[in-house]
Amino acid sequence: MALGIKEIQEIIPHRYPFLLVDKVEELEPGKRAVGYKNVTMNEYFFQGHFPEEPVMPGVLQIEALAQLGAIALLSMDEFKGKIAYFGGINKAKFRRKVVPGDVLKLEIEIVKMKGPAGIGKAIATVDGEKAVECEIMFAVGK
């Protein structure tokens, strides 16, 4: 199942300038998702990070992965209309810079669920090269 920006906005509450998933190419609700963030020089964070050498902050790369995870979870029938909250990050490793012009491929697999809480294994790549990998903990609220 593929989703455009309008469908994404129907699932998660994030909006500009904090919506960091531009499209979802693959979606298996409650299991996994693959999506993309097109990184352009127009991103608000490049004004200060860093003016002479723009680099997408690593925490925002992880936030993009968390938003993709929220899409995967909130697409499940039992979680539709709810909000997914970030619970924590484990084993985060940053492997390369993400700069204007890059297309960040986002992938997450939900590996554990216990009630409304769980863990996702996530990776973001640029042209097949790892940018960041981590485990994301989450909880679905009301």
From Swiss-Prot:
CDD domains per the UniProt record, alphabetical: FabZ
Primary enzyme class: lyase
Localization (cell): Cytoplasm
Family matches, as InterPro entries: FabA_FabZ, FabZ, HotDog_dom_sf
Primary residence: cytoplasm
GO terms of molecular function: (3R)-hydroxyacyl-[acyl-carrier-protein] dehydratase activity
Source species of the chain: Clostridium novyi (strain NT)
Family: Belongs to the thioester dehydratase family. FabZ subfamily.
Native organism taxonomy: Bacteria, Bacillati, Bacillota, Clostridia, Eubacteriales
HAMAP family (alphabetical): FabZ
Matches recorded under Gene3D superfamilies: Hotdog Thioesterase
UniProt-recorded name of the protein: 3-hydroxyacyl-[acyl-carrier-protein] dehydratase FabZ
Catalysis: reaction(s): a (3R)-hydroxyacyl-[ACP] = a (2E)-enoyl-[ACP] + H2O
Function text: Involved in unsaturated fatty acids biosynthesis. Catalyzes the dehydration of short chain beta-hydroxyacyl-ACPs and long chain saturated and unsaturated beta-hydroxyacyl-ACPs.
EC number: 4.2.1.59
GO biological process: fatty acid biosynthetic process; lipid A biosynthetic process
Residue numbers annotated as active site: H49
GO cellular component: cytoplasm; membrane
Alphabetized UniProt keyword annotations: Cytoplasm, Lipid A biosynthesis, Lipid biosynthesis, Lipid metabolism, Lyase
